[in-house]
């Protein structure tokens, strides 16, 4: 029987631990704070940011919110980033992406103080991840890849020497999880598949673990995986449900794969809650480093 990897449960346990650590920091006169910069009124982005602040309230982290209109200029956004860099109430912060059309997102991310980069996506912090194959890393780690590894660890899924096939090369998960999986502490062997990969299914069938992050609904089907594979579904697609008359979130892994797998993350309810929990963890760890 395959094991359902419950991201909601593990994220809840992590948040309980973080709340205890926040209380210890407060006893030392240190109040962790998460800042968010939201530009425009995209419903998805607004909902996501609201969820982050609800998480903050749950563990005792202060919310620092900055909002700009959709027609904000590059200079307006840059000024808001500088304000968050200098705000002592803000331990770490994120710039909610995507930014409005025409705004250079990479240039904005570059302006974030690496020590306040709650998403772990600043070039300096990614560089630290590239350089430090051994030992501990004291800089923030990308939230989604970290969440995946924490989730697998919570279920005692050993990745040492395992063949891991990563589907998708986006910076949020595909490229960065490869760096984390190949660190000495994890020691997996990684194949990164993308749009230029020949015979993706052949790579998938050899994998002990598949991390699907393509945004292609139901791409991973039973004929493409081996018996007993571990399936981690990070893909997000909005698919119209004719019966319900509305859009639903669907992952990259077809549910028909679950019986063939040894373990799987549902989607939604698998990796998503862990990504949010890791954002909080990054902020608490930033505060602890300055305690």
From Swiss-Prot:
GO terms for cellular component: cytosol. It catalyses: (6R)-5,10-methylene-5,6,7,8-tetrahydrofolate + NADP(+) = (6R)-5,10-methenyltetrahydrofolate + NADPH; (6R)-5,10-methenyltetrahydrofolate + H2O = (6R)-10-formyltetrahydrofolate + H(+). GO terms for molecular function: methenyltetrahydrofolate cyclohydrolase activity; methylenetetrahydrofolate dehydrogenase (NADP+) activity. It holds the Pfam family THF_DHG_CYH. NADP(+) binds at residues 168-170, 195, 236. Its EC number is 1.5.1.5, 3.5.4.9. It comes from the Bacteria. GO terms for biological process: L-histidine biosynthetic process; methionine biosynthetic process; purine nucleotide biosynthetic process; tetrahydrofolate interconversion. Keywords: Amino-acid biosynthesis, Histidine biosynthesis, Hydrolase, Methionine biosynthesis, Multifunctional enzyme, NADP, One-carbon metabolism, Oxidoreductase, Purine biosynthesis. Transmembrane segments: none annotated. Pathway: One-carbon metabolism; tetrahydrofolate interconversion. Catalyzes the oxidation of 5,10-methylenetetrahydrofolate to 5,10-methenyltetrahydrofolate and then the hydrolysis of 5,10-methenyltetrahydrofolate to 10-formyltetrahydrofolate. Belongs to the tetrahydrofolate dehydrogenase/cyclohydrolase family. NCBIfam families: PRK14193.1. Homodimer. This is Bifunctional protein FolD. It comes from Bifidobacterium longum (strain DJO10A). The lineage of its organism: Bacteria, Bacillati, Actinomycetota, Actinomycetes, Bifidobacteriales. The gene is folD.
């Amino acid at each position: 029987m395959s094991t359902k990897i419950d991201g909601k449960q593990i994220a809840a346990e992590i948040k309980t631990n973080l709340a205890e650590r926040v209380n210890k920091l407060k006893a030392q006169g240190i109040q962790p704070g998460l800042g968010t910069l939201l530009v425009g009124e995209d419903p998805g982005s607004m909902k996501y940011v609201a969820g982050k602040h609800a998480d903050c309230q749950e563990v005792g982290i202060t919310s620092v919110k900055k909002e700009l209109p959709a027609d904000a200029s590059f200079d307006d956004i840059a000024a808001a980033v500088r304000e968050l860099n200098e705000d002592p109430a803000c331990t770490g912060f994120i710039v909610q992406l995507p930014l409005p059309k025409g705004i250079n997102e990479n240039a904005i991310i570059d302006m974030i103080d690496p020590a306040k980069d709650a998403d772990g996506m600043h070039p300096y912090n990614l560089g630290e991840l590239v350089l430090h194959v051994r030992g501990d890393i004291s800089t923030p780690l990308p939230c989604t890849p970290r969440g995946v590894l924490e989730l697998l660890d919570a279920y005692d899924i050993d990745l040492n020497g395992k063949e891991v096939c990563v589907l998708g090369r986006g910076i949020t998960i595909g490229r960065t999880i490869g760096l984390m999986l190949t660190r000495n502490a994890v020691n997996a062997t990684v194949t990164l598949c993308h749009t230029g990969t020949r015979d993706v299914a052949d790579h998938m069938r050899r994998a002990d673990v598949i991390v699907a992050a393509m945004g292609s609904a139901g791409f991973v089907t039973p004929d493409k995986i081996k018996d007993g594979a571990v399936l981690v579904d990070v893909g997000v697609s909005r698919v119209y449900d004719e019966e319900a008359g509305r859009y639903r979130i669907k992952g990259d892994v077809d549910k028909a794969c679950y019986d063939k797998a040894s373990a799987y993350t549902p989607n939604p309810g698998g990796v998503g809650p862990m990504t949010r929990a890791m954002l909080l963890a990054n902020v608490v760890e930033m505060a602890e480093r300055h305690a």
